[in-house]
A protein has these predicted regions:
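Short, low-complexity disordered leader/linker segments with a strong preference
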Residues: 1-50, 447-463
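Extracytoplasmic/periplasmic solute-binding protein
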Residues: 32-34, 149-157, 162, 172, ...
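Hinge/lid segment of periplasmic solute-binding proteins
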Residues: 41, 110-163, 190-191, 227, ...
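Extracytoplasmic "Venus flytrap"/periplasmic binding protein-like
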Residues: 66-138, 147, 151-154, 172-175, ...
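Extracytoplasmic/periplasmic substrate-recognition and gating elements
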Residues: 68, 72-73, 78, 174, ...
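A structural signal for short loop-to-beta-strand junctions that line the ligand-binding cleft
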Residues: 96, 104, 132-171, 212-213, ...
Length: 463
């Protein structure tokens, strides 16, 4: 059953936060979880900020550059980094909170972090943002939970929009028209499927497919949502905080994906992905050169460049339209930072998150990693290959969708993934399987005292 506020489920979170003690939880604030005007940070007294991140070690260079940049402005602030995996984040962060040893700043698991918003673990940054004249909604590409129930709980880092990577070399060898040939990149879902049919082949004639049309996260409800949105439907009712994957528009879209995956084999299966990544020693299927189209986020751009090198020519296309009146609706996401309310160094912790979100931190991100959330620094990233990388920035100028997030989003996703795997394996009828998954996913939904998406419609249409 969907619950607006499940005290049984979040009371242990609230109790854990309360156990940290009123003095620690308030720490220069007017009340728990809310920052006051704040007094100036002493630039002479040494301060250590404990920073929890799930970024892998290959991104450590960016973090070190951030630390150097922060030191130039705040020489007394030292940042100690703890790196964990995203898979262990929820458990480890909650244990730290419950034991009274939480970090000061966290790189969010944005699909779970709202549970800590609503239980008072995170600092409401509204007064600090106002003090520093930061306008998040005007100046940043947002991912959906920086602002939650009228409060500011996070500062942006990256703008993680989705588009379609494509293998130009594969299309050329097959004698197929490049969608960018006319300089417009205007294409449809029908175009993508037609091209996918022509390149899906058993190239070595050993009886097994070894080249595919599309790599798509078909076991992830938000990635499938891009197709449903484009067709005019949705997988969630944001206004009423519930999943609707059992509704006609979703059922029709899932049936089509079933046909492309199971009947026509245009979409490479997860088992086939594992096999070709092992054979080619690559970290995703597109980089093997055996897939024509990969629906993925901008964060893949630099890793694609490193792993593909000059093996084949590739570029980026916008998510394909359904028709001339129904544009493609891609997914956008992002990974913001939050400050822990119990931090004894709140101002220093905030300054770390603020530096990352500020012009210098965002330029470092653009030069070393991905598309920054700060709009004024996005052009720095757009100088990187491929030719049409700007497609990722342009996502925010057209209709787009976001993840449907609640306190236990990850749990709902696990239910969905298991359900569609059974459906696509022929173990469960599609409609019955999605209806049961929808029921179970909705049982996991929990949120706080407000309707967090009140007034929001998907797709989001930029003003």
């Amino acid at each position: 059953m969907t619950t607006k506020t499940s005290r049984r489920r979040i009371i242990w979170l609230g109790a854990a936060a309360a156990s940290l003690g009123a003095a620690g939880a308030v720490a220069a604030c007017g009340s728990q979880g809310q920052a006051g005007a704040g007094k100036a940070l002493d630039t002479k007294q040494a301060v250590t900020v404990r920073y929890l991140t799930w970024w892998p070690l290959d991104r450590a260079g960016t973090i070190e550059e951030w630390k150097t940049g922060l030191k130039a402005e705040w020489p007394n602030i030292n940042v100690e980094t703890e790196v964990i995996t995203l898979g262990e984040y929820n458990t480890k962060f909650q244990v730290a909170v419950a034991s009274g040893t939480p970090p000061d700043v966290v790189l969010q698991n944005s699909h779970a972090q709202t549970r800590w918003y609503d239980s008072g673990v995170h600092l409401d940054l509204s007064s600090l943002v106002a003090r520093d004249k930061i306008n998040l909604q005007r100046d940043y590409a947002l991912m959906g939970t920086e602002l939650w129930c009228g409060k500011t709980y996070a500062l942006p880092m990256d703008a993680d929009s989705n588009a379609v990577f494509y293998n130009r070399t594969m299309l050329q060898k097959a004698g197929l028209r490049d969608p960018w040939a006319d300089g417009k990149g205007d294409w449809s879902l029908d175009d993508m499927i037609e091209l996918a049919r022509k390149v899906t082949q058993d190239t070595d004639r050993d009886g097994k497919l070894d080249q595919w049309g599309i790599a798509w996260s078909y076991t992830h409800v938000s990635h499938v949502a891009q197709f449903v949105w484009t067709k005019g439907g949705d997988v969630a009712d944001f206004q009423n905080m519930r999943y609707i994957i059992d509704q006609p528009a979703s059922l029709e879209a899932h049936q089509q994906i079933y046909n492309w995956l199971v009947k026509e084999h245009l979409i490479i299966s997860n088992a086939e992905i594992s096999e070709i990544q092992r054979l080619y020693n690559k970290s995703n299927p597109f980089r093997t050169g055996r897939v024509a189209f990969h629906i993925r986020a901008v964060a893949d751009v630099r890793q694609n460049t490193r792993e593909i090198s000059d093996a084949f020519e590739w570029d980026v296309l916008p998510f394909p339209k359904f028709s001339n009146t129904r544009p493609g609706i891609p997914l956008v996401s992002g990974n913001p930072h939050s400050v822990v309310a119990a931090s004894k160094v709140q101002e220093a912790a905030y300054q770390w998150a603020r530096f990352i979100a500020g012009p210098k931190g965002q330029e470092i991100l653009a030069l070393t990693q991905s598309l920054p959330a700060l709009k004024s620094k996005q052009e720095v990233f757009l100088k990187t290959p491929p030719n049409h990388v700007k497609v990722f920035q342009e996502v925010y100028n057209k209709p787009y969708g976001i993840h449907f997030r609640h306190h236990y989003t990850n749990d709902s996703w696990d239910i969905y993934g298991a359900a569609v795997n059974r459906i696509y394996a022929g173990e469960t009828p599609l409609q019955a399987g999605l209806q049961e998954a929808n029921r179970q996913m909705n049982e996991k939904i929990q949120y706080g005292q407000c309707m967090p998406y009140k007034g929001l419609t998907i797709p989001i249409r930029p003003k």
